[in-house]
From Swiss-Prot:
Pathway: Amino-acid biosynthesis; L-serine biosynthesis; L-serine from 3-phospho-D-glycerate: step 3/3. It comes from Mycobacterium tuberculosis (strain ATCC 25618 / H37Rv). Substrate binds at E194, R230, S273, G274, K318, N344. This is Phosphoserine phosphatase SerB2. Optimum temperature is 37 degrees Celsius. Activity declines at higher temperatures and is completely abolished by 50 degrees Celsius.
Length: 409
């Protein structure tokens, strides 16, 4: 049997129907074996690479080259043909993926990311755009040398702060694609604002409560103590204010899109909140969430007593709730995601397979796997590998695509 060699055929030019067909009709006539095919189209411009195996005399002869060139030139594109014996047939998979999100991503910002990557000997294997709304998003798949993941994360965290973009580094492999359960904090994450402050406004105690809340979110005050102190300011209010506040809740921009898309993907979705069940449950029903963990306000004769009943869902309680829900649905912890914004979310994000800090306080950003700084909850989807195109393609066949104009920053 004659020895065989590898030949790489690279086609470039404006994409059009019939290019692939024209090429493979010629290759079929020469009886070559197909080893690999890769194709990308950027703004209508095609790059098609075909790796084939053929006898040495065919590779070095003129017939294959002339026939391929004639076919490709006939459809108005260019082609290059070269021996490729020294390269692997299938590339080794990337080790990590880097997400860059911004409004906008400037050339300077991306240059800084690329410099940070190159300085550590990290190779960029693949780049693609994943979003043009509500932020610009890019995904880079990279190969990181052993021992360089930590330094890479440190370097890119510095770049993100200096260039005003979000940069996240995640392992790239099977585990990255197997997330199955996600939990959200409620206040300032799933919804805008703090529910306790809305209730306190009804009691004329919003200033006092806001100060306690800020201290707790910064990690300066034990959450259980802060909750009890804040709830105490509500004593004497009629329980009907709870329903009034529930009706006034405004979802975080992108929240419906996020939950709708995750449900399509088969995720179990829920909330774990230091807020109050009677306010959260109507929202959970509306969004068709699978589970809720939150605190319970004590009501006697239709009046708030200023106390909570039952176990307090505090910082350790949030992590426990995540573990309990994961166990209930048979989901390993490495396949869970948690999203939050405050210091009381630290344990929950640390327990999750992927912990995402959303417009978060510094204490949480320091321990999270990824941080998002734009007020659009659907940016969470991009960190899970879902593109804006995929989101809108699914919406187009269901509820329709809707983009709300975003004012310039």
């Amino acid at each position: 049997m004659p020895a065989k060699v590898s030949v790489l055929i690279t086609v470039t030019g404006m994409d059009q129907p019939g290019v692939t067909s024209a090429l493979f009709e010629v290759l079929a006539q020469h009886g070559v074996e197909l080893l690999n095919v890769e194709q990308v189209v950027i703004r209508g411009r095609l790059t098609l690479g075909v790796l084939v195996s053929c006898p040495l005399d065919v590779a070095d002869g003129t017939a294959l080259r002339d026939d391929v060139a004639a076919a490709i030139h006939g459809v108005g594109l260019d082609v290059a043909i070269e021996r490729s014996d020294d390269l692997p047939i299938i590339r080794q998979p990337s080790t990590h993926t880097i997400f860059v999100l911004g409004r906008p991503i400037t050339a300077g910002a991306f240059s800084a990311v690329a410099r940070g990557v190159a300085a550590l000997g990290v190779n960029i294997d693949f780049i693609r755009g994943i979003s043009d709304y509500p932020v610009t998003g890019l995904e880079l798949r990279v190969s990181v040398p052993p021992g360089c993941v930590g330094p890479l994360q440190i370097a890119l965290t510095k770049v993100a702060a200096e260039e005003h973009v979000d940069v996240a580094v995640e392992d790239y492999g099977l585990a990255w694609r197997t997330k199955r359960l996600i939990v959200f904090d409620v206040d300032s994450t799933l919804v805008q604002g703090e529910v306790i402050e809305m209730l306190a406004a009804r009691a004329g105690a919003q200033g006092q409560v806001a100060a306690i809340t800020e201290a707790a979110m910064r990690g300066e005050l034990d959450f259980a103590e802060s909750l009890q102190r804040r709830v105490a300011t509500l004593a004497g209010l009629p329980a009907t204010v709870i329903d009034d506040v529930a009706e006034q809740l405004e979802l975080m921009p992108g929240a419906r899109t996020t939950i709708r898309t995750l449900r399509r993907l088969g995720f179990r979705c829920g909330v774990v909140s230091g807020g109050f069940r009677r306010i959260i449950e109507p929202l959970a029903r509306e969004l068709m969430l699978d589970f809720v963990a939150s605190n319970e306000l004590e009501i006697v004769d239709g009046i708030l007593t200023g106390r909570v009943v039952g176990p307090i869902v505090d910082r350790p309680g949030k992590a426990k709730a995540l573990r309990d829900f994961a166990s209930q649905y048979g989901v390993p912890m490495e396949q869970t995601v948690a999203v939050g914004d405050g210091a009381n979310d630290i344990d929950m994000l640390g327990a999750a397979g992927l912990g995402i800090a959303f417009n978060a306080k510094p204490a949480l950003r320091e321990v999270a796997d990824a941080s998002l700084s734009h007020p659009y909850l659907d940016t969470v989807l991009f960190l899970l590998g879902v593109t804006r195109g995929e989101i809108e393609a699914a919406d187009a066949g269901d509820c329709g695509v809707r983009r709300v104009e975003i004012p310039a920053d």
